[in-house]
């Protein structure tokens, strides 16, 4: 038998309806004030919950969900399946520096020629390549159950927090992915959406929480309406004990699969109860899992020290914005770039808590960042009104890929190398989207949340054309791994030295270049559209390890040539929109 435990404090009668028509009454908890109803169902059966004879509801802590053929968004017909969860396995943190690759569990393998393309099981064969280029963490977009009738590809409208989306596979499949990653000294993180649900507002469908205990699970305003700080119709009431228990039940269950880290979508919603956020931190310490916050929602921006628990890592949106601006040649950003390169000390006491990224699932891909000046979202069905207009991108002089001149494509490849260099040689924890390393594109769509098609599926054919870029990324990750200063827990402080082209750093509004020296690295970054001669201002037997400024699409930017810098004063020409990295032998 499988236990059924339901929170429905206002109910007079709660029953389980089994698929064969049998009804089983649940019993109110011995503490009648508790609001909990208890019972059990046979292993393997499909069942729904009935509250006071109302329509069938999905158990919010179901282990698996099944949808009838006549299921529709406007007339839900979904059933819990009493399937036992796999035997618990432990997390296993990587021994390597963290380099995070974000991917969609379905889209990553959808175009592979194999029977299980688009399934969790297919991910296992992608892990060796990722490991070989230095990715030590695969972060999967939401894998929990959502409504397949909703036209939502990303999965950010959850139905059951602790069940695996049935179109991707089973909990056993996910456990096998985790085990395979651990064998390669890799971690698996999953993106969890526990701040809102697929039930939307009062006009949305009722699947479970609204029919069980609406007032306890959702946050409401003074007029009784749903607070919509997630932009999806509702938010979980993070101050409510039943809602907190539901969140923790889902996390506990996924942690039992050996998941190594959880990235919390719109974590500022949970921070409405700071003590709850800290209790999640305590739980994570006991389970040995990492916590990563998207530290904002529509109402609050809690990046850095404003977030209520310093043990959480955070997506650093300021790194994204400042570095994108610098990359495209905006003036006046040198002071901001200096902060981002050294782990954002204005925001974080511990640099590795900063998840540095230029791209994520929402927004442009890395290639689209250098190929489009504006979003191209018409296919999403909102007349181009969805998605941000603040992309901070530059198309290198030509919009899109159709008919692109050769010299523009050369510049784009250089900009891609620049982007990866800035990302991977900054202090903090770098993240990029899997496919960025070989020029993945979404055709300029920066919000393809409902595009379950070639727009979002990984196009593996591009690997051949962008082989040099993939080799470059692997090489820069190797440079990163060889310089512990980039992955140390302590801030750089006074260990980093900053320079301009021929003296102290140029912090003027027109400046577009900066150099720095730390831990055996000397980096010269020129985002101006003309070349600049940099004077090497630290003596040593330097070698050029990286030069992004090649004028072909086949060069990978990895070089190895000596530079005489004894005494100080050697001049190195850094080309237009280029970066040169020196390493000490």
Predicted regions: what they are:
Residues 1, 23-102, 107-115, 122:
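The feature marks proteins involved in alpha-glucan
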Residues 1-5, 9-12, 498-537:
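Carbohydrate-binding surface patches
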Residues 44-46, 562-585:
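C-terminal beta-strand-rich structural cap/linker in extracellular carbohydrate-active enzymes
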Residues 66, 70-74, 78, 272, ...:
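Conserved alpha/beta catalytic core and glycan-binding cleft of carbohydrate-active enzymes
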Residues 99-101, 138, 188-190, 262, ...:
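Hydrophobic faces of well-ordered beta-strands that scaffold small-molecule active sites
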Residues 104-258, 267-284, 290, 332, ...:
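Substrate-binding/active-site clefts of carbohydrate-active enzymes
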Residues 409, 416-444, 463-521:
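Glycan-recognition and catalytic regions of carbohydrate-active enzymes
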Residues 476-477, 530-563:
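C-terminal accessory region downstream of the catalytic core in glycan-modifying enzymes
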